[in-house]
Amino acid sequence: MSTGLTPPPQPIKRPPKAVTWIFAIIALVILIAPMSVGFYTDWLWFGEVDFRGVFSKVIVTRIVLFVIFALIAGFVTWLAGYFVTKLRPDEMSAFDTQSPVYQYRQMIENSLRRVMVIIPIFVALLAGLIGQRSWRTVQMWLNGQDFGVSDQQFGLDYGFYAFDLPMLRLIADSLSMMLIVAFLIALVGHYLMGGIRAGNQMTGQKSFVSRGARTQLAVTAGLWMLVKVAGYWLDRYDLLTKENSTFTGASYTDINAQLPAKIILLVIALFVAIAFFSAIFLKDLRIPGLAVVLMLLSSVIIGAAWPLMLERFSVQPNRAEKEAEYISRNIESTRYAYGITDEDVTYEENWGAGETTNEEVAADSATISNIRLLDPQILSPTFTQQQQLRNFYGFPDQLAMDRFEVDGKLRDFVVAARELDPNALQQNQQDWINRHTVYTHGNGFIAAQANQVDEVARDVGSTRGGYPVYTVSDLQSNARAAESEDAEELGIKVDEPRVYYGPLIASATDGADYAIVGDTGDGPVEYDTDTSSYTYEGAGGVDIGNMVNRAMFALRYQEMNMLLSDRVGSESKILFERDPRSRVEKVAPWLTTDSKTYPTVIDGRIKWIVDGYTTLDSLPYSTRTSLTEATQDAVMPDGTPQPLITDRVGYIRNSVKAVVDAYDGTVELYEFDTEDPVLKAWRGVFPDTVKDGSEISDELRAHLRYPEDLFKVQRDMLAKYNVDDSGTFFTNDAFWSVPGDPTAAEGRQELKQPPYYVVAADPETGESSFQLITPFRGLQREYLSAHMSASSDPVTYGEITVRVLPTDSVTQGPKQAQDAMMSSDQVAQDQTLWRGSNDLHNGNLLTLPVGGGEILYVEPIYSQRKDQASAFPKLLRVLVFYKGQVGYAPTIAEALSQVGIDPKEAQDIEEVDGTATTPSTDETDTDTDQPATETPTAPVSEAEGIAAINDALSNLEAARDSSFEEYGRALDALDRAVDSYQSAQ
């Protein structure tokens, strides 16, 4: 019989403590395991590259900082909670019975012990994680150096601002935040414990603060105000890096109003702190309350209103005169910070003011004979098609420039390493075994003289001519005596042409940048050539022969095959972190690296050269700049492509040259600026990691380049800071700007024109010199104002020359020259005719000072057949602009002749009748083997002529199913065979 009663609810069973602990341990493992795997594999990697000291120093520093910050923050938080519980009222009568806290008093009391543990631990962990990120600041402070240069206001060495001030700021800000947390804990805690009661107007109950609560809050607030006193003192120095509308640094208002205001507020803050401490003994809280009101009013009146009034009524009406001294300080400091002082930069005023004859221009052989026709930004597809060999090899989208001597003369070359392209692997090549154990490395070094092509391309429809003349050193050419001798004569013959490390190799879109190499016991398995395999013998790589290491890397890359595959044996090693720039940044975490990495040949080995910068966030009166914005141009619209230690800088030096071996990944760092105090500080942090500059070999020094990113930053600064008069600086009328790139694709022409590496006449000696150059236009004007060059030659490295054009005459700027060239009748006619079946590419528009006083513009035009996947650019025409005249021809010599310059010094080829050929592409990977298309030589008899025609016909038939380029070459070969036969009759 039902009673109608509802059974009592069953109590919820809690899971056993063992289960809770198991889940907690699993969660902890999931959280810590990835960090542990990364830590262990990185530790192995640093050992491989012999930079484990860097890894250890960084880890130890971060751990120590974590512990220090965690202990201090945890102790301060615990102490605040301890005093809350110690000073809480003992009686329940301390509570307002209407307060919502009243009914929870017992629950709060029961939770005290747990809260006293959880909150300090949480705050400690948070503070430790934040604090350990400041390891660079701490190490710089411990190893700081004097600059030998003092600021213009306080007379303190720049070393104080670079090394000491950031550390003092870190301490002050950290203490301030900890005390704020302690104050909030005390405030909330005493309210919950009944030590603080809000008044109740309905019951007439007054607000109440217990003596204990008043004491704790007053002491905490007083300590915070003392930290604020220190903050006001440090604020004085921060004024020197303040960014104003016209310049960076303390202005007239800052020095005459803000600086005294900081001192006054400092004194007031000290009295406020004393007032807070007085509340310990006085029951009346009105004294600290009035002190706080005084502090706030003083901040508004003295810290804001007074400077504002001085600025409005004294400075603004006379700004040019009032700010003159401080603008001069900004000019001096900025020039020092960016290495553009008068000691670093030579200005040639009124360059070109005199008359320069065409004969003088023609005699400028150092420039005229080295005019660059090959654009490294355009020719990557051409290199790929003609020098790829196999589908899995490739070249970067932007090739590099270097220089070599040819017959005793300096020439610039487009250079590239033939790398493995993991993103080009097809079908079964992408299988894990093939990708990571077979296709492991690239092959060879390619160089093409930048002022030459194989043959003149006069007809846009012909497949002959307009292509680079390559010098190659790879596994295949080393086996052929003639090609090996060519490479050796140029100085690029490599004893070890295999490329295991490079930016393209490391560009895998899935992030799986690694290769597994070593003897597996079954013989060589790595692809080397069509007829041979290879086993890696270099020192690079981390041992994964033991199961622990293998398991760790399997976890790192989430790849089970590492544990199961027979290709991984006891002698196996894993090569990873293969991007040269990333390797340098990892072993030198204090360096910012240049965005351009380039290959060269040193001591018979392919080496990657990486430029490293030491930077500072700011220096007194130095204008700050964004590295991302400064490096943006038409070629790099997004600026430097990798994360930076800091984007905004106020000081930069190219203090380190780094070299990465393409075969074994060895990283070498060389000191390159012996005067840089920042580098000296970092060498103190990481001793024996940077080699002395004296250890740079002559061969390496001959291939060092003035870095592009630094040059871009300096040209941005020189656009303004070429002005040394404060009055002129204030009016802006002598500022320059970097012109846009008129040859860029639609939508990018307003982006800055990139600088170009060229071989041209040295501004001082007139001898051939490898330089980085850029033009300047007037501010918001298109006329040319100046021309800047930086030398890369070993003897004159780093010398910057700025040719300043006369202001009483005008010289056409790059955009005006481009408009004139493209609007000339013949150019416009050809462009209209050719664009139907060809893509036309405007090459680099070079602005070349010639003859000691004239400007010559040169621009190559490239054509590429439309709608053909296998088509690639070739040089079709050369445009020149000189003294308002346009030259337009298939060769630079003809184009120069059209504008009145004798081309006898122009490096040019002779159009060979019937013997010139395009570089062979017979090694290019295809689906079916096709006979190579050969070019017959001129026959000497009727029988030989007939035989040559028959051979050409056979090759034409064989090439029918090949690419358009192969078929076109076969047609050309047939035409030449017929011509040769007819000429022999």
UniProtKB/Swiss-Prot annotation:
Region forming the signal peptide: none
Pfam families linked: UPF0182 (PF03699)
Ranges for region Disordered: 904-944
Membrane topology per record: Multi-pass membrane protein
InterPro entries for the chain: UPF0182
Bilayer-crossing regions: 19-39, 63-83, 115-135, 176-196, 215-235, 262-282, 290-310
Cellular component aspect of the GO annotation: extracellular region; plasma membrane
Keyword annotations: Cell membrane, Membrane, Transmembrane, Transmembrane helix
Compartment(s): Cell membrane
Main location: membrane
Biased amino acid composition, Low complexity: 929-939
Family: Belongs to the UPF0182 family.
Protein name in UniProt: UPF0182 protein Cgl0786/cg0896
Species, as recorded: Corynebacterium glutamicum (strain ATCC 13032 / DSM 20300 / JCM 1318 / BCRC 11384 / CCUG 27702 / LMG 3730 / NBRC 12168 / NCIMB 10025 / NRRL B-2784 / 534)
Organismal lineage: Bacteria, Bacillati, Actinomycetota, Actinomycetes, Mycobacteriales
